[in-house]
Amino acid sequence: MNLFDIFLKGGIIMWPILLSSIIGLAVSIDRFLMLRKAKINVPAFMVRIRGFIKKKDISGAISYCIEEKSPVANIVRKGLNKYRYGHDRVKDAIENAGSQEISKLEKGLSVLASVAGIAPLLGFLGTVTGMIQAFMTIEELAGAANPSDLAGGIWEALITTAFGLIIGIPALALYNYFLGAVKKLVGEMETVANDVIDVIQDDGRSDADIDDDVEMEL
């Protein structure tokens, strides 16, 4: 008996379980690739960004952010695009960009959580329908059923439960893994956002101090 034969013995409930597994796998692959692209060396990134801002090379900083292609770099880039309008506009742009990037990072996680919850429930539903089938067989045979007569219902009950758990457990584990990775990225985004805002604010204060000194000398 091969895997396909076992699948068929699980009955009609196996098809929605199979569908949920395909959806869960697709979401997991998509999120894995997204997280792989989103990784960035935050300390090294901030060293470069601070250097650009100190030198007033905002276009260079923006170009560097475009090269990095990560959520962290994206929020900094969108903030620096508003650099000429002042500190407050930069802060607002970074906050708005942060909300957008968080939504992108969390995309699909609710679907994966649903798969983790629904797959085992479908398995238990298959258990119920399988047991109903077994008891109907007993009733039809007036209580004279032998084990082979009940095998079909028992097969369905056990196989659907097993496959539901086989799909649900990894889906739950992957959901928690991706959720933790997203939280880590969000933390990095918040840290970088605050650092960039502070650097711009400090740089603005330095310029103001220089202007004051020039006026006093005059």
Language-model-detected regions and their locations in the chain:
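Hydrophobic membrane-targeting segments
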Residues: M1-A44
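Alpha-helical transmembrane segments of multi-pass membrane proteins
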Residues: I29-M34, I169-A181
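Hydrophobic alpha-helical transmembrane segments of polytopic membrane proteins
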Residues: W155-A173
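Glycine-rich helix-loop "coupling/hinge" segments at transmembrane-helix boundaries
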Residues: T137-E156
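Alpha-helical transmembrane segments of integral membrane proteins
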Residues: M14-V27, A113-G123, I167-A171
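Predominantly long cytosolic amphipathic alpha-helical stalk/bundle segments
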Residues: K39-L125, T129-L141, L174-L218
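Residue-level signature of catalytic and energy-coupling elements of molecular machines
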Residues: G11, L25, A61, V76, ...
